């Protein structure tokens, strides 16, 4: 047989050999780029069956009423831990009857096959008396013999790089990426070890996940302490919220009504504002600039290094220019998350938001103002106006009262909060590193046992 001499300078993966006996149905190079012939494998179809989900019938929609019937979507899938059904949409009994053959059951595996490709979720702890219907953007995988294959072990296999690379190579890359059921069933799975070996690997993963979650919980506890610390430093005591019927029926003198807000919610919530304390308070517009963001559409975007800050809690895309250099606060202007407070110490392109920054850093440090506004987050959410598309307007933000200690006190508070955030960030990084290392070791155990 002829020999092949590949240049040592050729980057790994740009040229490789595949035996003709190893080619099955496809001859495109990309599909075999990550092929590992040394892994003893079998097709998924030998171990499990599949069924696609189903879209809501024409003329049917979700219901706002709580029912025993839920519709499971890609967005309801969790990367770690048990399935979270709390965000599932409700459907009516009539809709369920039409879709009953697409029901999910305990220990089914779900794989996303449209849009976001390759997410894997084991269905666990279905709420009592609830029926779950699967979206058309997913398919369910049902194990043929649970006495030979633990569902959790198969879930771990499907999340390995070995399988995920096959999934990406098998998908159709169109405007909306798609993955055919036949391609999923054709996935090559490392041979399955005895159940006791499966259980050992699962146990190791669960221990790593538990350790990760404990570190994340410690980090969140630290972050949650920031509000209490800041309020204590400012000498502000939060009033206890009373939502009893008697407290919700009240009278207001006309002299107390001002600013054009005559609705009962504004008058009720004003008693729960975070203001006062041991330092003087100033209206926000007296001590800070409030500027509207610059309108931009997806057609105007030129991919670049600067995150576009719009109406959500994350940046939807990046642009090639910025309109603020950093050290600014954004408050989302519209949408479900209108009022969301976000501090940026880096350049941004501010779009559907209000941009806030200090008029005088010697009097008010912008980063300190950001921490105060985060404490007032719920108060700011209550400024939302409009039903279909809620908005938070700059004129309403301008009226917020801001406690204003002297600059050294602001600096002390900022330093303490930064230390808390740094400690929390370290714990979060350790948590992800711990799990990442465990996943790599587990994948090696799974693949190593199949060689």
Where do the model's predicted regions map?
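Sequence-specific dsDNA recognition surfaces
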Residues: 41-60, 76-106, 282-330, 344, ...
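Short coil/turn segments at secondary-structure boundaries
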Residues: 57-64, 86-87, 169-171, 241-245, ...
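Short, flexible loop/turn elements at secondary-structure junctions
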Residues: 76, 114-115, 145, 288, ...
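Non-catalytic DNA-recognition/assembly elements of restriction-modification systems
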Residues: 1-56, 191-312, 406-451
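A short glycine-rich beta-alpha junction/loop motif
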Residues: 131-139, 152, 171-196, 347-354, ...
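Short, ligand-facing micro-motifs at secondary-structure edges
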Residues: 78-90, 109-112, 116-134, 152, ...
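Short, conserved charged micro-motifs
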Residues: 147-153, 196, 361-367, 410-411
């Amino acid at each position: 047989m002829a020999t092949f001499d590949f240049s040592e300078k050729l980057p790994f993966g740009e040229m490789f050999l595949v035996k003709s006996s190893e080619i099955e149905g496809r001859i495109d190079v990309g599909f075999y780029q990550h092929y590992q012939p040394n892994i003893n494998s079998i097709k998924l179809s030998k171990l499990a069956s599949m069924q696609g989900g189903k879209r809501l019938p024409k003329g049917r929609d979700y219901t706002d009423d709580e029912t025993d019937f839920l519709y499971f979507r890609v967005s309801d899938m969790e990367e770690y831990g048990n399935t979270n059904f709390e965000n599932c949409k409700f459907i009516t009994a009539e809709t369920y009857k039409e879709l009953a053959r697409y029901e999910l059951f305990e220990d089914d595996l779900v794989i996303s096959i449209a849009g976001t490709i390759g997410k894997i979720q084991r269905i666990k702890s279905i709420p009592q008396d609830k029926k779950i219907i699967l979206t058309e953007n997913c398919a369910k995988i049902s194990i043929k013999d649970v006495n030979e294959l633990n569902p959790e072990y198969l879930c771990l296999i499907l999340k390995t790089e070995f399988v995920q690379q096959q999934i990406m190579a098998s998908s159709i890359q169109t405007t909306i990426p798609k993955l055919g059921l036949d391609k999923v069933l054709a996935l090559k799975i490392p041979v399955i070890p005895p159940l006791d070996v499966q259980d050992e690997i699962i146990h190791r993963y669960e221990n790593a996940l538990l350790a990760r979650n404990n570190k994340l919980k410690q980090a969140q506890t630290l972050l949650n302490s920031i509000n209490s610390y800041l309020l204590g430093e400012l000498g502000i005591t939060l009033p206890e919220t009373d939502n009893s019927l008697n407290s919700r029926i009240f009278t207001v003198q006309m002299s107390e009504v001002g600013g054009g807000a005559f609705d009962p919610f504004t008058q009720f919530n004003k008693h729960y504002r975070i203001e006062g304390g041991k330092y003087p308070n100033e209206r926000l517009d007296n001590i800070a600039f409030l500027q509207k963001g610059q309108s931009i559409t997806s057609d105007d975007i030129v991919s670049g290094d600067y995150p576009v800050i719009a109406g959500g809690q994350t940046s939807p895309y990046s642009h090639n220019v910025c309109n603020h250099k950093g050290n600014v606060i954004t408050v989302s202007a519209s949408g479900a998350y209108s009022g969301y407070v976000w501090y940026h110490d880096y350049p941004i392109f501010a779009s559907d938001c209000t941009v806030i920054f200090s008029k005088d850093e010697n009097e008010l440090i912008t980063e300190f103002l950001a921490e105060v506004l985060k404490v007032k987050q719920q108060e700011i959410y209550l400024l939302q106006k409009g039903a279909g598309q809620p908005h938070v307007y700059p004129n309403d933000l301008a009226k917020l009262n801001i406690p204003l200690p002297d600059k050294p006190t602001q600096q002390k508070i900022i330093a303490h909060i930064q230390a808390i955030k740094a400690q929390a960030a370290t714990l979060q990084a350790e948590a992800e590193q711990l799990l990442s290392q465990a996943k790599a070791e587990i994948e090696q155990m799974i693949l190593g046992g199949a060689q």
